């Protein structure tokens, strides 16, 4: 009798684990999509960087975002604010944009190789730069020792945990868009040729009003969609299935 009850419990538990595995196998190991940090204010794409006017757009809160395609392209948007220990009223801030290709090695290491001429950084140090931020090119290859994709137990959404080259975990990222919200996966600002400056209109500066207008327009130029749980086996569905199976198992346990 006890052996039959124990076997029944094992079958029920096995069924639940199988259902969860089937649900997770297709997406749980995929970094495809746009991921954003907890502030949920920093996203890759045209809302962060305008490659035509080379304009970095400051989000409302600091944060980090990565996007990955299925064919090996990535994009990064970072907005960092750090305190100034000598003068707390003068925090330093930087906005960084990079994109390029990525590869995942057999041991799980994730390497991001940026397009050298496309990276941009806007650095602000208000107590030392007389109110004029420094805008420069930026090129930094990034290596993550490993990564892990899972489901947040509180929010029921996918999370991406990146580990730095020394194994230190970064802040978790949450899936925001799938397909990803990104700028074109090609060189956006190729090195200018000698003849590209012959046209006087190419050196004409745009007004601040036109730059701001363009940045606002860019926010809507994407085919990315907000990630929604469209699968039948969502995290809530798995919870209800497991609860139901445990309930049925309890009844069968008492009956036999």
From Swiss-Prot:
It holds the Pfam family Rot1. Residues 25-235 are lumenal. N-glycosylated. It is found in: Endoplasmic reticulum membrane. One of its GO terms (molecular function) is unfolded protein binding. Residues 186-209 are annotated as: Disordered. Residues 190-200 have a biased composition (Low complexity). It comes from the Eukaryota. The keyword Ribosomal protein does not apply. One of its GO terms (biological process) is protein O-linked mannosylation. Present with 2360 molecules/cell in log phase SD medium. PANTHER family: PROTEIN ROT1. Belongs to the ROT1 family. This is Protein ROT1. It comes from Saccharomyces cerevisiae (strain ATCC 204508 / S288c).
